[in-house]
């Protein structure tokens, strides 16, 4: 993760904007734009949902809502600080036993989204650790992973990203 964690938010946004532009240039329907990510990618989902106003839906699997203080130079605002800027419908999928993202942070994210009047749903899986969807790791939890994937697919269908 050192290389990924050294990427400034501005560069992340530029890369994702370029990806969207490329998809559009290839005939992709960017009016149905959605984003999904896991772990650091889940954090990126929350950040990009605030950056790209065309995004319809965002699904964050165990995305960090609060950044470590040491990252402030590269990541000036935590996802939770960007909540007022979010336009996309946000689905957050978290493990209750996540050692890196305490339930208290998930609750803070929920409160911020609710307080800002955002369209969102947060689901926390009892006993599931961080990485519960990674079937190549010991943290994999089949039942939670399958339900979370079904939730994500349904979310994208509900908000017009998938048909």
Regions found by a protein language model. Give the residues of each.
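Short beta-strand/loop motif that positions the catalytic acidic residue
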Residues: 86, 92-94, 98
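Conserved alpha/beta-hydrolase "acid-adjacent" motif
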Residues: 99-105
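Short beta-strand immediately N-terminal to the catalytic nucleophile in serine-hydrolase-like folds
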Residues: 35-37, 61, 93
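A conserved short beta-strand
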Residues: 54-65
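Gly/Ala-rich beta-loop-alpha elbow adjacent to hydrolase catalytic centers
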Residues: 37-41, 45
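C-terminal catalytic histidine-bearing segment of alpha/beta-hydrolase fold enzymes
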Residues: 114-163
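Alpha/beta-hydrolase fold nucleophile elbow
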Residues: 23, 27-38
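Alpha/beta-hydrolase active-site loop
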Residues: 2-26
């Amino acid at each position: 993760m050192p290389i990924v964690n050294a990427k400034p938010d501005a560069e992340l946004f530029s890369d994702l904007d370029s990806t969207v532009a490329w998809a559009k240039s290839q005939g992709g329907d960017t009016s149905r734009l959605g984003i999904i990510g896991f772990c650091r990618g889940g954090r990126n989902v929350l950040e990009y949902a605030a950056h790209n106003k065309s995004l319809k839906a965002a699904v964050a699997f165990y995305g960090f809502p609060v950044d470590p203080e040491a990252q402030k130079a590269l990541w000036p605002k935590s996802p939770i600080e960007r909540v007022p800027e979010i336009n996309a419908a946000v689905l957050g999928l978290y493990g209750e036993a996540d050692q890196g993202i305490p339930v208290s942070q998930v609750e803070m994210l929920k409160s911020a989204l609710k307080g800002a009047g955002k369209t969102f749903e947060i689901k926390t899986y009892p006993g599931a650790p961080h990485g519960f969807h990674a079937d190549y790791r010991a943290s994999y939890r089949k039942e939670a992973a399958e339900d979370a994937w079904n939730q994500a697919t349904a979310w994208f269908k509900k908000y017009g990203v998938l048909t």
